[in-house]
Amino acid sequence: MAFALLRPVGAHVLYPDVRLLSEDEENRSESDASDQSFGCCEGPEAARRGPGPGGGRRAGGGGGAGPVVVVRQRQAANARERDRTQSVNTAFTALRTLIPTEPVDRKLSKIETVRLASSYIAHLANVLLLGDSADDGQPCFRAAGSAKGAVPAAADGGRQPRSICTFCLSNQRKGGGRRDLGGSCLKVRGVAPLRGPRR
């Protein structure tokens, strides 16, 4: 019996308009936005009055074309920030499509997405190391037990509750459903198992 390991489709294939920024580009975008003057919010009277009580000149506030330059810089910074925010949101959308959730159409917040992705990566690492064909369908618990030796005792002398992997629990609830399909949690999301007609 042979099994094929299916790889998930990369986000760049599903979302070709997503451009990954390097850390330097992201930091530059953020610092550019924070370095800009907020002179665009002032009225024309404030621009004619000149510098405020603090004396000195503002960045970009000198000369007759100063307010226009400041407005353009602010608009450019806003456009960069919109693009950055859109690319982050698109990346989160791509990540959400790769993480199994119950119910399937559940909307995850950004922090839930990051936490669930981290948990799912740990689960898949345990599946790769140990396989998911354990009797109880919980390879993550087996990995935690073998790493710690046993479930640690609580301060009051009792045993602490065992840690539960969401994905192992989901597998266990579904019974042998995934194991019947080849015993792998590594199926590409979106490929539904063949089911008989509903009654």
Swiss-Prot record:
Residues 25-67 are annotated as: Disordered. Gene3D superfamilies: Helix-loop-helix DNA-binding domain. Coiled coil: none annotated. It holds the Pfam family HLH. Residues 51-66 have a biased composition (Gly residues). Heterodimer; efficient DNA binding requires dimerization with another bHLH protein, such as TCF3/E12. Interacts with MEOX2. This is Transcription factor 15. It comes from Homo sapiens. The gene is TCF15.
